[in-house]
Amino acid sequence: MKISAIHISFVLLLTLSIVSCGNEEDFIPDSSFIKIYNDEFFESSYIPMDIVQAGNTGYFILSAYDAWNTYILRVDEDGEYMWDYKLEDNYVNPIKGLYYKDSAFYFFCMDDLSLAATLMKVTDQSKTAQVERTYGNIIYPLHSSAVDDGFLLESYNRESYSTRLTKLNNDFGIVWEEEYEVEQDVEESIISHLTRIGNRLPFFSGQAGNKYFLNGYYNYSMSMLFVNASDGTQTGVINGFRDKSAISSAKYLDGNSYALSRFDFGENFIIPKIDLNTSGTGISSDLEGNEHPEMMPNAFVYSQIIDVNGREITMYATSTKGGQILLYAYDAINGTLVGTHHLGRLNPYEAIDFVATNDGGLAVLGNTFVNGRFSRITLIKLSEKELIEFAN
């Protein structure tokens, strides 16, 4: 009954969304849309985490609800509701890192009693989430990402006061684990981040040639670490200052070049191309970049390297002080700004992530507040034409 009630409210809101789209943005039918996914229980709060495209059959959205419970939403290629599912209350803390593999969706969450990282599997046939694997020695999962031959899982070990990186193979089996000392207990900050009662922190990880990088607590502060891909041994670090100054996003370009963003005591900087010494020690506040005062203080920033009409573009998505989603497009080769694009006008919007779509467009996942107070999932689709107009 609960799922049916949610289903009805989704359908009603999607109908309203279709009618109102033309008033908000000049979108091309069938290739562009704005969808806001509502819940008839107004007290419920939804905080989207990640999105993945399922071939040509639409999108799968992972979300938290009511602080840190786990929710999944399936929509078709036009953003229309297909089905949804709320996991049992003991599976909490869904983290960024959502994968479509062999017609199934995979993501990590956490057991609320043991705190153990748990791998979930979801299919369109089951329309539910099933436990695929439990990692009993990995607690407080924070972020996961895909690499060439598997996956990375970042977590926090409260017993050793350390950030842990676990390398998983393509079947999600453990290859190696390594820890990096924080030197103090940051469990309270971790819990505040996970339950969303305090500052949200920019955990991320990725691959750069024969090295991996991760952003997490190290040496008292949020820092970006560089490690060997073969065993996780640390080679370099860019130190932040506590949780007040740090790297907020990073994407590897080539050679020693990265596309970064950083925050420093409320100010935000975008660095579309910079060479880093991944075998040395640096400080995030020393990295020069363009300040962007329009962004929210200590803004969350999401970046990807995407192809736009045959041109490699570093795309950044973030949130503005005025309650809009802002996209920045930079040439990935020379780092020059190509264009910007604002999304959202009627309700306040926050950027969560985005994915380049199979039809050459862009699907932007966001958070919006209906009537200024009810936190809901939103999906904004840009057509290939709209993307090319500002990003190429």
Spans of model-derived segments:
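Bacterial Sec-dependent N-terminal signal peptides
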Residues: M1-I3, V11-Y46
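A short beta-strand motif characteristic of beta-propeller blades
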Residues: F33-F42, Y81-E88, K127-T134, I174-E179, ...
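Beta-strand-rich domains and repeat architectures in extracellular enzymes and scaffolds
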Residues: D39-T70
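Repeated scaffold domains used in trafficking and secretory/extracellular systems
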Residues: S45-V52, Y91-Y100, G136-V147, D185-S205, ...
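Hydrophobic strand positions within the blades of repeat-based beta-sheet folds
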Residues: I51, F60-L62, I72, W83, ...
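Short glycine/acidic-enriched loop and turn motifs that connect beta-strands
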Residues: Y65-N69, D111-A116, Y156-S162, Y217-M222, ...
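Beta-propeller blade signature
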Residues: I72-E77, T118-Q125, T163-G173, M222-S230, ...
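Blade-level signature of beta-propeller repeat domains, shared across WD40, Kelch, NHL, RCC1
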Residues: E350-N392
